Design a protein with these regions (language model features):
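ATP-dependent carboxylate-amine ligase
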Residues: 56-64, 70-80, 84-222
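Acidic, Mg2+-coordinating active-site environments of NTP-dependent enzymes
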Residues: 1-93, 217
Length: 222
């Protein structure tokens, strides 16, 4: 058991995930495998790292790369985690309702390259949004649709600290998710994506993040 634990630590420390041009490759212990990003449902650099770890463990268990890749291509990730919901009227919709902190929203926007509108906001727990605001001020996403209590606070902080950003008309302040979806549907161009990644808790508005994601899915696909 100790030897296995030590090997797992080594895998974690030495795993590399390299993105070059249109390829993503996991490398460990002199071996490598190309991750077929376009053929899998797991999105994001953090998931690609986890895929690399799983692949290295499979090598330890003498599972062939072809078998690993076959399983990877059919793996269905858990819902509400940067989940592709489908396409309607040419707009692709992604549900990242599990996002309750700044970092996850930043990861989502770094992963999806064609987002026209991102929906942010929820219950206000008093967390610091300065990192997310700095990121958004330099990110090319055309429309940032803010909702609920944290959306209002983010809007006010941007207005005070980034007045030029606020004047760019990229910010849309709404009350609730339903209003935010209506704005997103008007603003998102066909062929582009609409992402809900709230960076906030759902409590007091929804039962949990799962319900928030389910409501979002119903609103965008109805």
């Amino acid at each position: 058991q100790g030897a296995v634990s030590e090997e797992m630590v080594n895998i974690w420390k030495k795993m590399e995930v390299i993105q070059e041009n249109d390829t993503t490759e996991a490398r460990y212990d002199g071996h490598s495998i190309e991750i077929p990003v376009s053929q899998i449902r797991l999105l994001g650099q953090h998931n690609y790292f986890d895929i690399g770890i799983a692949w290295a463990v499979c090598r330890l268990l003498n599972i062939r790369d072809e078998v690993f890749l076959e399983g990877l291509k059919t793996y269905e990730p858990l819902p509400h985690r940067l989940q592709f919901l489908g396409e309607k009227n040419g707009i692709k919709y992604y549900d990242d309702s599990i996002s309750t902190i700044c970092e996850t929203t930043i990861q989502a926007l770094n992963t999806l390259k064609d987002v026209d509108a991102v929906l942010i906001g929820g219950m206000d727990r008093g967390i610091d949004y300065s990192e997310l605001i700095r990121f958004l001020s330099g990110h090319p996403v055309p429309y940032i649709i803010l909702m609920e209590a944290t959306g209002k606070r983010i809007f006010e902080e941007i207005r005070q600290d980034y007045p030029d950003f606020q004047k760019m008309e990229r910010l849309i302040l709404t009350d609730h998710l339903e209003d935010a979806v209506k704005e997103a549907q008007k603003l998102t161009r066909p062929g582009h994506s609409c992402l809900m990644s709230p960076a906030a808790a759902s409590y007091g508005i929804f039962k949990n993040f799962e319900e928030r994601g389910e409501v979002f899915a119903r609103l965008v696909l109805k």
